[in-house]
């Protein structure tokens, strides 16, 4: 996979270019440069660790939107087996901005679904850049109700800039579709685990984000509006997105401190896209242990705990 570096990663990119140049020289001239390459690799690793240990909120937002960041299909391929995709909301369309279907986790049946932004231009357009319309949310709800009927736990992957704000989506009652999902997910009698893998934009994320365990990856974000949108409203200047991101508290560690999510999963050095297999392995271990624990909770108690979790958010003494 071709690496892409963000602006704040430029020192890392420069070192990587030097390492690649030395490898080419050594390969062409049969010169042993292994010691120098090893020294630069160690320096690059140290530099990467130093940069990523002190990222600003706006830089984390850029990481959450990284063009190579793993998407729902990447996690499905690595975490689950026997995935069988299910299409459509049975009313309007195939609803491709959310992908979902039945799969197995360690041999046990689960229902898995999540936003899919797409990777190449054609797929991005087909997936509507991961921005769900009413049909996507109704499709998601159909799959979750199917999971409830067949006693399968639900795993959702959240990565969207927000619900699609187009005229057609409004005509098909976008707000009702989101509200209905919030209402239904709070009552569905099966374990639900929600994982924020990239950006979680407002109601577009919440519509598949009500669960018994809410998990965020280290460099993911959760917000009611994008930093650019916030800056445009407050200061009439989208270039102040960095300042807005800092004030909004959108990062995983801030969200966790405010007790809005249950846990934050560390990412491989440099972000999840640097080692997708390792990131998926960490999530698989976590999902396995969390689902085992949730299955032991009586369903009536599970629903009550889920309800109380969300009712307690934002409460003040």
Curated annotation (Swiss-Prot):
Q: What class of enzyme is it?
A: transferase
Is Repeat there in the keyword field?
A: no
Annotated localization: Cytoplasm
Which pathway, metabolic or otherwise, does it act in? Answer: Lipid metabolism; malonyl-CoA biosynthesis; malonyl-CoA from acetyl-CoA: step 1/1
Per UniProt, subunit arrangement is: Acetyl-CoA carboxylase is a heterohexamer composed of biotin carboxyl carrier protein (AccB), biotin carboxylase (AccC) and two subunits each of ACCase subunit alpha (AccA) and ACCase subunit beta (AccD).
Q: Where is the CoA carboxyltransferase C-terminal domain?
A: 32-293
Task: Briefly state the protein's biological role.
Answer: Component of the acetyl coenzyme A carboxylase (ACC) complex. First, biotin carboxylase catalyzes the carboxylation of biotin on its carrier protein (BCCP) and then the CO(2) group is transferred by the carboxyltransferase to acetyl-CoA to form malonyl-CoA.
Q: Which family does it belong to?
A: Belongs to the AccA family.
Looking up NCBIfam families in the UniProt record yields: accA, AccA_sub, PRK05724.1
Q: Which GO terms describe its molecular function?
A: acetyl-CoA carboxylase activity; ATP binding; carboxyl- or carbamoyltransferase activity
According to its UniProt record, which reaction does this protein catalyse? N(6)-carboxybiotinyl-L-lysyl-[protein] + acetyl-CoA = N(6)-biotinyl-L-lysyl-[protein] + malonyl-CoA
The protein here is known as Acetyl-coenzyme A carboxylase carboxyl transferase subunit alpha
Q: Name one Pfam family in it.
A: ACCA
């Amino acid at each position: 996979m071709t690496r892409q570096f963000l602006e704040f990663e430029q020192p890392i990119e420069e070192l990587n270019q030097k390492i690649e140049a030395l490898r080419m020289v050594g390969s062409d001239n049969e010169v042993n440069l292994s010691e120098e390459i090893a020294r630069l690799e160690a320096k690059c690793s140290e530099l990467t660790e130093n940069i990523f240990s002190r990222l600003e909120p706006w830089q984390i937002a850029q990481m959450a939107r990284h063009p190579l960041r793993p998407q729902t299909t990447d996690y499905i391929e690595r975490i689950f087996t026997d995935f069988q995709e299910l299409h459509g909301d049975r009313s309007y369309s195939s609803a491709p901005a959310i992908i979902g279907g039945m799969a197995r986790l360690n041999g046990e049946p689960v229902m898995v679904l999540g936003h899919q932004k797409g990777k190449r231009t054609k797929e991005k357009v087909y997936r509507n850049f991961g921005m769900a319309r009413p049909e996507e949310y109704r499709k998601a709800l159909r799959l979750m109700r199917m999971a409830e009927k067949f006693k399968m736990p639900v795993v959702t992957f959240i990565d969207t800039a927000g619900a699609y704000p187009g005229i057609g989506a409004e005509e098909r009652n976008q707000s009702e579709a989101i509200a209905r999902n919030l209402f239904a997910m709070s009552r569905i009698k099966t374990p639900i685990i929600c994982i924020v893998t990239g950006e979680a934009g407002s109601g577009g994320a919440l519509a598949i984000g009500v669960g018994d365990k809410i998990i965020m990856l280290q460099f993911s974000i959760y917000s009611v509006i994008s930093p650019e949108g916030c800056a445009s409203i407050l200061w009439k200047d989208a270039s102040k997105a960095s300042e807005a991101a800092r004030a909004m508290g959108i990062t995983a560690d801030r969200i966790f401190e405010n007790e809005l999510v249950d846990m934050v999963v560390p990412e491989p050095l440099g972000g999840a896209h640097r080692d997708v297999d390792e990131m998926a392995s960490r999530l698989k271990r976590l999902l396995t242990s969390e689902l085992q624990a949730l299955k032991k909770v009586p369903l009536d108690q599970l629903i009550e705990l889920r309800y109380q979790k969300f009712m307690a958010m934002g409460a003040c003494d």
